[in-house]
């Protein structure tokens, strides 16, 4: 299984690069990479807006995680769907993929392991935090073609809304709180 971290956005609502924010001694990008490697053999990071600042983080972590790589999403401004589509096309089509975002500081290795414990070849596994569906999302190789041609601001929500029979929801009691606006940064003490 390959981890795919979507970290190409410009963080316009936050006003600064969320990938570079430090939480518990690590940037949010580094934290996401470590979480992905807790269950994945290789990880690909989609970069865009902050490539000059994020590539050095990835290069430093390659010493610890030799199967870590990144790709620059040319049209990252189009939205998350563009990064998702480009990232999925880059990864071998025969591999299952775990999609993560880099702005979810509440995620733990236990969340990753619980999601992967339900992995199968026929259904996507979607995390739900107190009723809010969100990545991480496990996508089996058999469903990956459904994402071909995605672009724009089509996140994964479109997938689980249009294909409920192809998704299994794993419920967590944790509150969903990402890092999107300055108030979120204050909430997390970042």
Ranges and model annotations:
Residues 111, 142-143, 175, 184:
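Short, well-ordered alpha-helical scaffold segment located
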Residues 13, 53-57, 146, 178, ...:
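Phosphate- and divalent-cation-binding pockets in alpha/beta enzyme and binding domains
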Residues 3, 149-190:
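Conserved alpha/beta core of the MobA/IspD/sugar-nucleotide pyrophosphorylase nucleotidyltransferase superfamily
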Residues 1-133, 165-172:
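Nucleotide and nucleotide-moiety/phosphate-recognizing core
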Residues 26, 94, 141-143, 182-183:
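Short loop segments at secondary-structure junctions
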Residues 113-161:
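Flexible, gly/pro- and Lys/Arg-enriched active-site loops
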Residues 15, 30, 144-147, 183-189:
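N-terminal/domain-start segments enriched in small and hydrophobic, helix-friendly residues
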């Amino acid at each position: 299984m390959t981890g795919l971290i979507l970290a190409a956005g410009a963080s316009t609502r936050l006003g600064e690069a969320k990938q570079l924010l430090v939480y518990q001694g690590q940037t949010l990008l580094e934290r996401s990479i470590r979480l992905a490697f807790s269950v994945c053999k290789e990880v690909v990071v989609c970069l865009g807006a902050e490539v000059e600042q994020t590539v050095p983080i990835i290069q430093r972590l390659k010493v610890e995680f030799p199967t870590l790589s990144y790709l620059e999403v040319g049209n990252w401004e189009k939205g998350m769907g563009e990064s998702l589509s480009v990232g999925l096309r880059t990864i071998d089509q025969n591999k299952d993929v775990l999609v993560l975002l880099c702005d979810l500081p509440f995620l733990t290795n236990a969340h990753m392991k619980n999601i992967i414990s339900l992995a199968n070849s026929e259904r996507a596994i979607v995390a739900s935090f107190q009723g809010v569906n969100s990545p991480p999302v496990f996508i089996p190789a058999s469903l990956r073609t459904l994402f071909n041609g995605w672009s724009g601001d089509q996140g994964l929500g479109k997938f689980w809304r249009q294909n409920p029979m192809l998704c299994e929801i794993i419920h967590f009691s944790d509150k969903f709180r990402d890092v999107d606006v300055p108030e979120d940064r204050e909430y997390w003490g970042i």
